[in-house]
Amino acid sequence: MEFQNLIEKRRSVRKYAEGNTVTKDEILSMIKAAQEAPSWKNSQTGRYYCIMDTKDVDQFRRECLSEMNAGKCENAVLLVSTFVHNRAGFQKDGTADNELGNGWGCYDLGLQNENLILKAEELGYGTLIMGIRDADKIREFCSVPETETVVA
């Protein structure tokens, strides 16, 4: 699929068909595409946590998402995206390069997530980026280290 077609075709999906199975290799392909995005000094601070098992997805929906969003990811594979703090936008001694500081990690993750969702579209899968969630519960559920920020 040509890039312009991907951009024009891609939409946020709020209902997923039952039985539409995403493979581990396809998930890895999406993450590889995400990792090709540029980042601050090539720091590559984005991280992904994948939930594929139906029982785990259902538990995650109940425990970590608002009621509004929980219904939107039924029959879906879930990817949690995070970034490592104090690397993108920072010097080796830990001082911020400018006023944005950790904002650069979030910016870089946005670039990565764009690549990921466009790759998903190319593979025939719809996506929905959800910001309304309980970051603390996600951190616990996915064992996300305190050195990372849960974004979506």
Where in the sequence are the language-model features?
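Arginine/glycine-rich "motif VI" loop of SF2 helicases in the C-terminal RecA-like domain
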Residues: 72, 122, 145-147
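Short basic, glycine-rich beta-strand/loop surfaces that mediate nucleic-acid
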Residues: 59, 141-152
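Structural motif
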Residues: 77-79, 127, 148-152
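Small-aliphatic-rich amphipathic alpha-helix that forms the alpha element of a beta-alpha
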Residues: 34-35, 80, 97-141
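A generic local secondary-structure boundary/capping motif
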Residues: 68-71, 140-144
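Specificity-determining recognition surfaces
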Residues: 1-28, 150-151
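Glycine/small-residue-rich phosphate/adenosyl-binding loop
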Residues: 26-28, 32, 36-110
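Short beta->alpha linker loops
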Residues: 22, 52-55, 133-134
